From Swiss-Prot:
One of its GO terms (molecular function) is gluconate transmembrane transporter activity. This is Uncharacterized permease YojA. The gene is yojA. The chain crosses the membrane at residues 2-22, 24-44, 52-72, 106-126, 134-154, 174-194, 228-248, 261-281, 305-325, 343-363, 377-397, 424-444. Signal peptide: none annotated. Disulfide bonds: none annotated. It comes from the Bacteria. Keywords: Cell membrane, Membrane, Transmembrane, Transmembrane helix, Transport. Belongs to the GntP permease family. It holds the Pfam family GntP_permease. NCBIfam families: gntP. It is found in: Cell membrane. InterPro entries: Glcn_transporter. The lineage of its organism: Bacteria, Bacillati, Bacillota, Bacilli, Bacillales.
Length: 444
């Protein structure tokens, strides 16, 4: 049974990492081989599947991660992150700083992939937490929750956009309903969950994070740092750039010559590269910092995220083995005939696929193809089907998803602490989202 094989594989992975203390990347590759064999994959295709998984994962993330680490390091070394932190503290105060971080993360998350937003915001949140002597996780977990909600629920993110088409839903309606549902979901899974987690898992909130990609933390005099405006614009330029590109792309006609150019420069990799070039000027050249010192910062930022990239690639290998091994097809056949509510079916299928395959996007897209035929004409609002699927696709982030390893490494958590905080948070987020969708379904 494929589900049992996957469960055993996850248990072996946890044993290797927690008990044997084997390197996480090596553990992921070993388990990928074992699960592939258990699923009955052609032995000659196992290596190709693992290579495809690593390449596909890093092909999406390596460029963004690398350029993001460079950008973050340049802003950090120049004191830009410190300036942003101090300004936010002065404007919002200690009591309201968590709310400020959540709102900013939610707005930024609409335009950015979860991984990109995390890379950009982590250094700023770290600086704020350090200045206020707060637990890093106190601000970091609500920030990540807001990013995850927008990733799963709101266009123009790939999964919500693609499944809107599959269900025949109006994108504007999905965005409107999505924001209405995403706001209470973010509050419950972010700040409210944070209060619960701080009491139940205090050890996790004593961790100081692992921002090795940004190098050693420096001390700054405020009057020697860049201004707030230039620091904020430089840090968030990828967000601004991609948001503007998305808007222009929607306004231009499908056959417009400028549409392809706008979409090209609005991709995460291109936007991050342009943002890095801006940072080289605003945080380097304009501040009379030598190119030798700038080059040193860039080199150190890359060398110190190498292992994290390998771990994320290993997670991609595990995910690809599950896909190629037919786990998704097995789940599809299981749910093919059912009399449950289409909204609940869509959420359940997406949740099971997410647990098995890891990728929220793959889970959502696969679910759309399976659940669309279950909708009788006019029986359910297509926009709510999109949101139910999105809610299911973000449940219980664990070892087969890159986001799990990013949160673990950035926040400096143990495996157990990552399950207690991040995996539990994403489960709360998913169930809350489903509840909001079902309530909306009663009145629509």
């Amino acid at each position: 049974m494929p589900i049992l094989i996957v469960a055993v594989g996850v248990l072996i992975l946890l044993f290797l990492i927690i008990k044997v203390k084997l390197n996480t990347f090596v553990s992921l590759i070993v388990v990928s081989f074992l699960v592939a064999i258990g699923l009955g994959m052609d032995i000659n295709k196992i290596v190709l599947s693992i290579e495809t998984g690593i390449g596909g994962q890093l092909g999406h993330l390596a460029l963004v991660f690398g350029l993001g680490a460079m950008l973050g390091r340049l802003v950090s070394d120049a004191g830009g992150g410190y300036r942003i932190a101090i300004t936010l503290i002065d404007k919002f105060g200690r009591k309201r700083i968590q709310a400020a971080v959540v709102v900013a993360s939610f707005i930024i998350g609409i335009a950015l992939f979860f991984e990109v937003g995390l890379v950009l915001l982590i250094p700023i949140v770290y600086a704020i937490a350090k200045e206020l002597k707060m637990p890093f996780l106190y601000l970091g977990i609500p920030m990540a929750a807001a990013l995850n909600v927008t990733h799963g629920f709101l266009p123009p993110h790939p999964a919500p956009t693609a499944i809107s088409v599959a269900y025949g839903a109006h994108i504007g309606q999905v965005l409107l309903f999505g924001i209405i549902i995403a706001v209470p979901t973010t509050v419950i899974a972010g700040p409210l969950f944070n209060k619960f987690a701080m009491k139940r898992f205090p050890g996790a909130y004593q961790k100081h994070g692992n921002l090795s990609g940004l190098g050693p933390r420096k001390e700054f005099q405020l009057d020697e740092t860049p201004g707030f405006a230039i620091s904020a614009v430089t840090s968030l330029f990828p967000v601004i750039f991609m948001a503007m590109a998305t808007i222009f792309s929607l306004l231009l006609s499908e056959h417009s010559k400028g549409k392809d150019i706008i979409e090209f420069i609005g991709t995460p990799g291109t936007a991050m590269l342009i943002s890095l070039l801006l940072a080289l000027y605003t945080m380097g050249y304009a501040r009379k910092i030598s190119m030798q010192e700038i080059g040193r910062s860039i080199s150190e930022s890359i060398s110190q995220i190498a292992m994290m990239l390998l771990i994320i690639g290993g997670g991609g290998a595990f995910k690809q083995v599950l896909i190629d091994g037919g786990v998704g097809d097995y789940v599809a056949d299981f749910f093919r005939q059912t009399n449950m509510s289409p909204l609940f079916v869509a959420w359940t299928i997406a949740a099971v696929l997410r647990l098995c395959l890891g990728s929220a996007t793959v889970a959502a897209l696969t679910t759309a193809g399976m659940a669309a035929p279950l909708m009788e004409a006019g029986s359910v609002n297509p926009a709510l089907m999109v949101l139910a699927t999105g809610a299911g696709s973000v449940i219980a982030c664990h070892v087969n998803d890159a986001g799990f390893w990013m949160v673990k490494e950035f926040f400096g958590l143990s495996m157990k602490e990552t399950f207690q905080t991040w995996t539990l948070l994403t489960t709360v987020l998913s169930v809350t989202g489903l509840g909001c969708v079902l309530l909306a379904g009663l009145v629509m």
